[in-house]
Amino acid sequence: HDFRGFSGQIAGGVVRRGQTVLALPAGIRTTVKAIHTYDGAVEEAFCPQSVTLVLAHDVDVSRGSMLVSPDQLPGGSTDLHAQICWMHPRALQPGRKVLLKHTTSTVQAIVTDIEHRLDIATLEPQPAPAGLALNDLGEIRLRTARPIFYDGYATNRLTGSFILIEPGTND
């Protein structure tokens, strides 16, 4: 029996049998031939269901890939701008190498800039010449080793969030 399905969780919207989807990062369009859930085949599924999708074409889909509607494309870039809460005792400074975990994918990244820290009492931007200290809120810029596809956090917190990991300790 020749079955090739791709399993994952729907992070937003609805997927329907017969719908055209775009596989990212491959950039290949295909059609959803079938949708399977724990209860069997269904015509449509929605967030946050776990599904197995059967696609009409062989496409390069692996851990961390996204299947999206061509009409509602996420952002995609190696240069990211983010608001973060720094939760490590060693200050976060420009040039620091980190691992960025986004959905189910982990990629190497480097902090290119600390734009500012936020004063917790006023939420006003403050200079951060020493970087971000433990529990600081701030805005940073990162460059990743490969493109990340994302939505704004206010739109979709599953695809609009990430965590930074210390490579040597996994902190």
Regions found by a protein language model. Name each.
Residues 2-171:
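C-terminal effector/interaction modules appended to NTPase cores
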